């Protein structure tokens, strides 16, 4: 951030989840006021078996900085807080676990095919992290991220609950809204084209550099 400000260059971070079609729809829905006050939520990316590059870069804290919290969590936390309107965190609590370092079960995750397995390598990061963030507006966000845990199947999600409606965002599957109309419970399932979040993010970056539009991502959001 300091280098960007000193040089006058544009700093943006790849936050591709923001650029899916259903993410944009959800953001516009929230900003229209249809969710009301968002006061709590959950987000996670949990795998049954999906440890990337066991023994190598991913599982060596001195190189990667951490396990699924820093690998997977950053993407879902960013999406959740962005949808919530970027409130400022004031307190965080959590716990981490390393229970599958010696588990050699086959991976069932298509998202875990990164890095090469290193025999007799290092595994000193967590394989599961859970926590909660409390924000300056009183809202809370629960977190859960794992490379390996005994669950049914891999899922990545954001759930937000507002005073007027709630939503569930699920990976490439889309977004659903839960509300009521005329005294009846209603579900809204918009048919959005997901698109390629990475491509859309890069197009926005080019637009920022070439046409000087305001960046969707601001460095302070990452710092928070």
Predicted regions: what they are:
Residues 169, 192-203, 217, 224:
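Active-site loop of classical SDR/Rossmann-like NAD(P)-dependent oxidoreductases
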Residues 152-157, 178-188:
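A short, polar/proline- and glycine-enriched secondary-structure boundary/capping micro-motif
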Residues 65-68, 118-119, 189-193, 211-220:
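Active-site rim elements
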Residues 7-10, 17-122:
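Predominantly a Rossmann-like dinucleotide-binding segment in NAD(P)-dependent oxidoreductases
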Residues 1, 6, 136, 204-224:
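C-terminal helix-rich "cap/oligomerization" subdomain common to oxidoreductases
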Residues 78-174, 202-213:
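Contiguous beta-strand/loop segments that form the cofactor/metal-binding neighborhood of enzyme cores
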Residues 11-13, 42, 143, 169:
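Hydrophobic residues in well-ordered beta-strands that form the structural core
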Residues 21, 71, 155, 197-200, ...:
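Residue-level signal for the nucleotide or nucleotide-sugar donor/cofactor binding architecture
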């Amino acid at each position: 951030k300091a280098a960007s400000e000193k040089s006058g260059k544009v700093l943006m971070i790849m936050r591709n989840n923001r650029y899916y079609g259903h993410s944009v729809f959800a953001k516009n829905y929230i900003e229209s006021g249809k969710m009301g006050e968002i006061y709590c939520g959950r987000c996670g990316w949990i795998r049954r078996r999906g440890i990337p590059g066991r023994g190598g870069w991913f599982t060596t804290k001195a190189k990667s900085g951490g396990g699924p919290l820093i690998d997977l969590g950053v993407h879902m936390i960013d999406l959740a807080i962005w949808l919530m309107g970027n409130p400022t965190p004031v307190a965080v609590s959590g716990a981490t676990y390393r229970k599958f370092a010696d588990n050699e079960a086959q991976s069932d995750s298509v998202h875990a095919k990164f890095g090469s397995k290193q025999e007799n390598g290092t595994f000193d990061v967590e394989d599961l992290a859970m926590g909660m963030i409390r924000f300056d507006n009183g809202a809370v966000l629960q977190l859960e991220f794992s490379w390996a845990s005994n669950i049914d199947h891999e899922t990545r999600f954001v759930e937000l609950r507002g005073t007027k409606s709630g939503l569930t965002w699920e990976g490439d599957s889309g977004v659903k809204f839960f509300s009521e109309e005329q005294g009846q419970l209603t579900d809204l399932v918009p048919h959005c084209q997901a698109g390629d979040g990475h491509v859309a993010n890069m197009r926005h970056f080019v637009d920022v550099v070439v046409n000087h539009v305001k960046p969707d991502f601001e460095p302070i959001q990452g710092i928070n």
